[in-house]
């Protein structure tokens, strides 16, 4: 496993991952709204491509914050907690989202193939299948961008739109740190449930 600065990331496309029939999407440990939203976006895309896909996280603690448990419940996000990750190696492709496989904030799960989708600076290189865009305010924006590249109809899925909106909202300190035009484009284009966003905000 190579460390910081060993290689420059290229812009991987979701199309490159469609050769896998079984796909596991892993959020970082103790996932926040952005990680959950990003994972949900990828889950919806691969599910609609007919893939056998699951969305999970590991680590010491289950998600317990009221805003996040409400987000998962109200938006129908199939997020599962993996209590014993070493006992269940991943068959097929493992995608880490909003984190990088081998970094300190994500439990390592043995996997045949690995891909990384993240909006943080490069920490660990473990695969050629990487998409890092640290100039974006949220990983939700990166996933939205990748879905746009595939002409995936995000606007038709209000639950997904709500998740992506809330992920950006939380990762940019309630939009106060919003500066990238792509983040702004996503915020303006999403079809989301204002009442649910208010519910999540008020329960945080």
Pin down the residues of each PLM region:
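Active-site cofactor/cluster-binding pocket
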Residues: 73-129
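General alpha-helical segment detector with a strong preference for membrane-spanning helices
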Residues: 36-38, 102, 122, 175
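Short coil-to-helix leader/linker segments, especially the first N-terminal amphipathic alpha-helix
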Residues: 1-7, 73-78
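A structured phosphate/pyrophosphate-recognition subdomain
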Residues: 2-30, 40-47, 125-204
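Generic detector of well-ordered alpha-helical packing
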Residues: 33-35, 99, 119, 172
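Anionic-ligand anchoring segments at beta-strand to alpha-helix junctions in alpha/beta enzyme folds, i.e.
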Residues: 20-87
């Amino acid at each position: 496993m190579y460390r910081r600065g060993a290689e420059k990331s290229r812009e991987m496309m979701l199309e490159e991952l469609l050769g896998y029939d079984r796909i596991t999407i892993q959020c970082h440990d103790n996932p926040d709204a952005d990680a959950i939203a990003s994972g949900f976006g990828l889950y919806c895309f691969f599910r609609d491509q007919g893939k056998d896909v699951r969305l999970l996280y590991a680590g010491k603690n289950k998600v317990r914050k009221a805003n996040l448990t409400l987000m998962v419940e109200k938006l129908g996000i199939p997020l599962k907690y993996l209590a014993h990750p070493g006992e269940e190696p991943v068959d097929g492709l493992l995608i880490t989202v909003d984190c990088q496989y081998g970094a300190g904030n994500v439990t390592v799960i043995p996997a045949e193939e690995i891909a990384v989708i993240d909006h943080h600076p490069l920490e660990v290189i473990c695969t050629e299948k990487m998409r890092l865009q640290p100039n974006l305010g949220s990983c939700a924006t990166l996933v939205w961008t990748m879905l746009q590249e595939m002409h995936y109809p995000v606007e038709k899925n209000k639950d997904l739109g709500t998740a992506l909106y809330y992920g950006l909202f939380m990762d940019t300190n309630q939009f106060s740190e919003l500066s990238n035009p792509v983040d702004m484009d996503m915020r303006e284009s999403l079809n989301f449930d204002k009442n649910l966003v208010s519910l999540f905000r008020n329960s945080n």
